[in-house]
């Protein structure tokens, strides 16, 4: 079980937990889960308008298991789930809460990973563009 919460500002401890989560995901996936704009907003050097979503385990020893960032200016969301807690419905629960509350218009998925594809399919999302790294 976990607790999903919505924030306009994050405490330093939450920022550190998100950064650690993103690092674990990047190591597992070999691609960063958040783009530069999201990283800057997380660090307080980007958009002050973003909404942070935290999914925290009910077990304090585990801590943060999911994070999403919504930019309300364009309605886009970036979402990441801790690699050790994937395939448990965490991403879907987080995404569904964001959809119900903030009505995003687009989602970013980096690396075209199977988990992101499965989540997008489950939510009825379709690919509208792709990025090629050359």
Please name every model-derived segment:
Residues 1-40:
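Short amphipathic alpha-helix that is part of the acyltransferase structural core
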Residues 65-70, 79:
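Conserved GNAT-family N-acetyltransferase fold
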Residues 72-76, 83-134:
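Acyl-donor-binding surface of acyltransferase catalytic domains
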Residues 18, 79-81:
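Long, contiguous hydrophobic alpha-helical segments, chiefly transmembrane helices and signal peptides
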Residues 5, 77-79:
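Short, well-ordered strand-loop elements centered on a beta-strand within folded domains, enriched
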Residues 41-66:
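Conserved beta-hairpin
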